[in-house]
């Protein structure tokens, strides 16, 4: 991080929610020692086909309104007794081509929290076929499209869906460049977004921040 600071990095958007290893003490220490601002999040992560494994029990057993109340309180008062407030809502869902009930619940809670707080939803959706259902849900919750970021929009590079939902107003995040073997699809996609006047909705990130421990290390 110090090296990143020296190269001009000022802020890191840190996307680890509760249940996936969020550690505020570590984030505070890293921020102080590096001089980089770190934006933490609230939310829940149910990607990678793990069926709720990384979603805390309290969220799994709570109603939409109960989850909304907890997340809203974190934005208004801070997380637990730390005084640290998250900057956005992080979700992961839909990696099996459909959105399961738990995933729908956290998405609706996120939409309601966003409406109360004005905070954006950063939503991991690798399987592009799940996006229409996710957008339908936020439409039912009457959430403005520009409060929703489609993380891994470049995962399958489904240009039909990228253009369709980009035109609705959602944010499009390209973040798999770090592990890409073929880079030719990126300039082609970016050129198409430019032609459709959607470049202002394109975000770039690096999806390389996770460390998955082995079963025998848990």
Please identify what each model-predicted range represents:
Residues 24, 49-52, 130-137, 158-166, ...:
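Histidine/acidic-residue-rich catalytic or RNA/ligand-binding cores of hydrolases
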Residues 17-18, 43-47, 94, 126-128, ...:
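Active-site beta-loop-alpha junctions enriched in small/polar residues
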Residues 2-25:
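Glycine-rich, N-terminal phosphate-binding loop and its surrounding beta-alpha-beta segment
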Residues 10, 87, 200:
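Short acidic/polar active-site loop segments enriched in Thr and Asp
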Residues 122, 175-176, 199-217:
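Short acidic/histidine-rich active-site segments
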Residues 116-184:
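Active-site core of metal-dependent hydrolases
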Residues 29-32, 37-120, 171, 176-180:
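Active-site gating/metal-coordination segments in enzymes
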Residues 2-6, 27-35, 75-84, 112-115, ...:
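Acidic (Asp/Glu)-rich catalytic clusters
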């Amino acid at each position: 991080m110090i090296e990143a600071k020296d190269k001009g990095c000022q802020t890191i958007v840190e996307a680890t929610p509760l249940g996936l290893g969020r550690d505020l003490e570590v984030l505070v220490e890293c921020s102080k020692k590096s001089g980089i601002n770190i934006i933490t999040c609230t939310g829940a992560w149910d990607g990678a086909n793990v069926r709720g494994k990384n979603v805390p029990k309290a969220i799994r057993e709570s109603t939409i309104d109960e989850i909304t109340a907890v997340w809203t309180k974190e934005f208004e008062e801070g997380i637990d007794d730390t005084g640290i407030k998250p900057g956005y809502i992080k979700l992961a869902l839909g990696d099996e081509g459909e959105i399961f009930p738990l995933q729908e619940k956290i998405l609706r809670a996120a939409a309601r929290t966003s409406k109360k707080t004005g905070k954006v939803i950063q939503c991991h959706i690798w399987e592009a076929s799940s996006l229409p259902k996710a957008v339908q849900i936020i439409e039912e919750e009457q959430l403005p499209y520009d409060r929703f970021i489609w993380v891994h929009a470049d995962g399958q590079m489904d240009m039909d869906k990228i253009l369709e939902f980009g035109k609705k107003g959602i944010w499009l995040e390209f973040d798999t460049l770090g592990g890409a073997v073929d880079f030719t699809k990126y300039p082609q996609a970016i050129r198409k977004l430019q032609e459709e006047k959607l470049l202002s909705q394109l975000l770039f990130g690096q999806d390389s921040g996770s460390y998955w421990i082995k079963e025998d290390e848990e």
